[in-house]
Amino acid sequence: MVLKSKGSVLDLEHDNQTLKDYISVFERNKMRLTQSRLMLLQCLVQHRDWHTLAELKHHLEQNQQRTTLASIYNNLKIFAKLKLINIFVDTNRFETYYCLRHENHKHIYFFDENQRKFLTLPLQDKEALSLIGHKSKHGKIKLNDFYIVASGTLEDDQ
């Protein structure tokens, strides 16, 4: 599968390599890569921003890929299980955002209302662990599986 892109040749080559890398995760885990999963992966690679379910459905439909929200949701859960994507919940809007996991990382996130994008809050791992430490004592939440999304605006001097 080769991605079609309106971007530069370098972007297209990077996107194709990225897609191949994600496909190899399915192969290593002996997971079936269905056409709908491949199309969803391709959509996430091409549109690197954060996505809601509705946005993903819209992107797929623009490329003549008929699908349902339930199918997209189920595939995203599989992607999360394989650690291909991060899932973030904006508690003010009750919206869930999905993004490809380009590297293994630990962050606390902030959604900047003005810029309409996620930024990393300047917390060290120990500070983050202390914020959720009461839950991690029971072994149910690991730092890498727990993300905080705060809303508001981030000033330049912060």
From Swiss-Prot:
GO MF term (any one): DNA-binding transcription factor activity
UniProt-listed Pfam families: FUR
Coiled-coil parts of chain: none
BP GO annotations: negative regulation of DNA-templated transcription; regulation of secondary metabolite biosynthetic process
Name recorded for this polypeptide: Uncharacterized protein MG236 homolog
Origin superkingdom: Bacteria
Entries under PANTHER family matching the protein: PEROXIDE-RESPONSIVE REPRESSOR PERR, ZINC UPTAKE REGULATION PROTEIN
